[in-house]
Amino acid sequence: MKTIRVVAAIIRKDNKIFATQRGYGDFKDGWEFPGGKIEEGESPEHAIVREIKEELNADIIVGDLLTTVEYDYPNFHLSMDCFWAELAPDSHMKLLEHEAAKWLSIDEIDTVDWLPADVEVVKIIKERHNY
């Protein structure tokens, strides 16, 4: 089975995390943490900065690795490095690829339909509840 390596940013602000709704592809309308594929020769930290700039036109400060999720979708295996992140000072997000976005508190985190691999991340966030 093909493995796809991706990164995701768990962007925190005012005790909320940022979630995006996919606007394209097989998983259209599913909710996820923003991010994308790691390019050959690229570090995960560099990839997440690049992806957030491409998807949200925003600059972020990458924090600690929260977790790496290994998930088997029907046609591929996903390996997803998930990093805590914050918006850089004076940076604002604009949706360039996603259909919608929300800031979610811990009480609201289960109100969206998360993609399967992101469900694993949500479980860890709820267990740690440290954002």
Segments from the language model and where they lie:
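A conserved beta-turn-beta hairpin within the catalytic core of GNAT-like acetyltransferases
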Residues: D26-G30
